[in-house]
């Protein structure tokens, strides 16, 4: 579950920018379910008993793709970039962006050697 202070903005970012489909949204429960292929993500406003000002996840969400370059071309001019696409010595070609909440999203594919 990803917490957000802007449920509709997050649904819009994931659907309009990243290409997810909104499977379900409940304004009463302040919750939404999003899907992209085999990926399912749930987002919600934080519960009252959970202190939350902004995204504070200390890691990243890694999307392993068949071709990160395709996603890079689609996203590079529409998102906040953490680092541009590049090849890494550990055998991955990847890039990273921030979503509308500040969560770090990485996209990569394995390099053929």
Where do the model's predicted regions map?
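N-terminal beta-strand motif that seeds the catalytic metal site of vicinal oxygen chelate
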Residues: 1-11, 59-61, 111-113
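Residue-level preference for alpha-helix termini and adjacent loops
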Residues: 6, 12, 87-91
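Short, conserved charged micro-motifs
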Residues: 9, 68-72
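Vicinal oxygen chelate
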Residues: 21-64, 72-98, 109-113
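Conserved active-site tyrosine of GNAT-family acetyltransferases
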Residues: 10, 14-15, 75, 99-102
């Amino acid at each position: 579950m990803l917490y957000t202070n802007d449920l509709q903005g997050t649904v819009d970012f994931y659907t309009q920018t990243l290409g997810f489909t909104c499977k379900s949204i409940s304004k009463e429960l302040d919750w939404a379910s999003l899907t992209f292929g085999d990926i399912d993500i749930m987002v919600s406003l934080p519960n009252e008993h959970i202190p939350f000002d902004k995204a504070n996840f200390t890691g990243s969400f890694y999307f392993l793709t068949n071709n990160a370059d395709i996603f890079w071309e689609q996203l590079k001019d529409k998102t906040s970039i953490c680092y541009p696409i590049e090849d890494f010595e550990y055998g991955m070609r990847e890039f990273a962006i921030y979503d509308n909440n500040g969560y770090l999203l990485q996209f990569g594919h394995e390099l053929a050697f």
